């Protein structure tokens, strides 16, 4: 695949994935560090790159607005100040999404959900526009949210549509399938919210929309990638058949912050004076 070659680290070549899977505050930013490859920390690469205008930041923690997407950028091994900054961004008792933590969260945090995932990259996808696909925008959000509620492809919120191009297919005027763009590390774009209504499943609409979204990404000279649950073997088989290949096994977590925020670094320093 030509575009992937420009960004490539070796793609894991192995049997089918589906077969195998049965102290600074907001005013004092600290350097944010991530993995050597943008897809090792895709939220960080997005929020410090093409999606920087969405970023809400405190210390080394960056997140998207709560009505855009749950993705949060954080160090591989958050320290006490990072957790304090996460709590401040989430708010007392608020929820926040993290990925692939090396250690369990500190006392006071509650893990609401832990999902084993897979990350796949375009290796040999044949992208092509789809004559039936239409561009979706803010006016379509109520229908998009309704389709997501029925099909559960993963998080899709009222402003997620602002992250990139979303395409849909309508039958009888009703939105029955969609897919679009979410995370945007430099040189890469994530395909997300791939879903089809039960009434039209088996007609190949999901594959058509993935290829159509991939076409727009490739036209920009970028490479598509995507995430899904490791348990979603049907989706993994589809993506592999389209030409995506396994790259990594991230873990996605949804956490609830402590009901009472920890003291800030400034407050701790003041108490010592």
Task: Walk through the language-model features, giving the residues of each.
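N-terminal charged segments
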Residues: 1-105
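Short amphipathic alpha-helix that is part of the acyltransferase structural core
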Residues: 2-39, 123-154, 265-273
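A short, internal acetyl-CoA/4′-phosphopantetheine-binding micro-motif in the GNAT/acyltransferase core
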Residues: 72-78, 194-201
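Conserved acetyl-CoA-binding loop-helix of GNAT-fold acetyltransferases
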Residues: 81-86, 202-217, 236-241
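Conserved beta-strand-loop-alpha-helix junction that forms the acyl-donor binding cleft
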Residues: 98-102, 216, 225-236, 252-262
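Conserved active-site alpha-helix within GNAT-family acetyltransferase domains
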Residues: 103-109, 207, 230-248
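Conserved catalytic-core motifs of GNAT/GCN5-like acyltransferases
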Residues: 110-122, 227, 245-259
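A conserved beta-strand-loop-helix scaffold within acyl/acetyltransferase catalytic domains
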Residues: 155-165, 169-197
């Amino acid at each position: 695949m030509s575009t992937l070659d420009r960004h490539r680290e070796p793609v894991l070549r192995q049997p089918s994935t589906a077969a195998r899977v049965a102290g600074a505050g907001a005013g004092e930013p600290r350097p944010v560090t991530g993995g050597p490859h943008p897809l090792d920390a895709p939220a960080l690469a997005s929020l410090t790159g093409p999606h920087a205008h969405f970023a809400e930041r405190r210390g080394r923690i960056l997140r998207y607005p709560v009505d855009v997407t749950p993705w949060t950028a954080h160090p591989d091994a958050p320290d006490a100040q990072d957790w304090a900054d996460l709590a401040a961004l989430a708010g007392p008792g608020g929820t926040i999404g993290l990925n692939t933590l090396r250690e369990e969260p500190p006392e006071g945090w509650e893990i609401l959900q832990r999902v084993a995932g897979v990350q796949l990259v375009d290796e040999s996808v044949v992208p092509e526009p789809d004559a039936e696909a239409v561009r979706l925008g803010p006016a379509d959000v109520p229908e998009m949210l309704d389709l997501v509620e029925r099909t559960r492809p993963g998080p899709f919120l009222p402003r997620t549509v602002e992250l990139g191009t979303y395409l849909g297919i309508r039958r009888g005027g009703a939105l029955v399938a969609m897919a679009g763009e979410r995370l945007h590390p430099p040189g890469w774009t994530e395909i997300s919210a791939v879903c089809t209504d039960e009434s039209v499943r088996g007609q190949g609409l999901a594959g058509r929309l993935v290829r159509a979204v991939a076409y727009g990404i490739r036209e920009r000279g970028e490479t598509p990638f995507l995430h899904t649950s490791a348990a979603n073997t049907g989706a993994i088989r589809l993506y592999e058949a389209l030409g995506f290949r396994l790259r990594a096994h991230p873990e996605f977590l949804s956490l609830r912050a402590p009901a009472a925020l920890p003291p800030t670094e400034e407050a701790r320093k003041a108490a010592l004076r």
